[in-house]
């Protein structure tokens, strides 16, 4: 699924939107992706674009409490990934509500790709869907700064 999401971002980012599900399925099949993986990716993307925050506490976006990861979350999101999420929140890229949505979305992804790669992709999709990637420097700032942060 990760490869499909990367493919979609790389091929549709510049256009600002992506085609309907049937067209995407056809194009992804022609690109050689597996039908089951296509379905998983498109379902994940559909859920992602709805920004359902109903199950989260009111006022979470303004919260300044410390987040502790559950055992299950720590099994899926490694130390580097958790550190990157903390970095994004401290840098003001995401608020606590966006952090929770990010964690949920990363957990819903499958595969053996590193957590940081998944997290970066989810953040890119979130910013893309919210039309916050209009400034091409946003991507560079996010990833250059985060990469230098992780080297320390």
From Swiss-Prot:
This is Protein Smg homolog. HAMAP family: Smg (MF_00598). The lineage of its organism: Bacteria, Pseudomonadati, Pseudomonadota, Betaproteobacteria, Nitrosomonadales. Pfam families: DUF494. Belongs to the Smg family. It comes from Nitrosomonas eutropha (strain DSM 101675 / C91 / Nm57).
């Amino acid at each position: 699924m990760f490869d499909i999401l990367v493919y979609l971002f790389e091929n549709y980012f510049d256009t600002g939107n992506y085609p309907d599900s049937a067209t995407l399925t056809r194009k992804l099949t022609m690109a050689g992706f597996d039908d089951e993986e296509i379905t998983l990716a498109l379902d994940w993307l559909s859920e992602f674009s709805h920004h359902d925050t109903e199950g989260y506490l009111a006022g979470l976006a303004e919260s300044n409490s410390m987040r502790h990861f559950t055992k299950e979350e720590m099994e899926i999101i490694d130390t580097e990934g958790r550190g990157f999420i903390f970095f994004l929140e401290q840098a003001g890229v995401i608020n606590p509500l966006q952090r929770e949505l990010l964690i949920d979305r990363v957990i819903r992804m499958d595969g053996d790709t590193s957590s940081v790669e998944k997290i970066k992709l989810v953040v890119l999709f979130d910013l893309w869907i919210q039309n916050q990637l209009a400034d091409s420097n946003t991507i560079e700032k996010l990833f250059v700064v985060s990469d230098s942060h992780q080297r320390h």
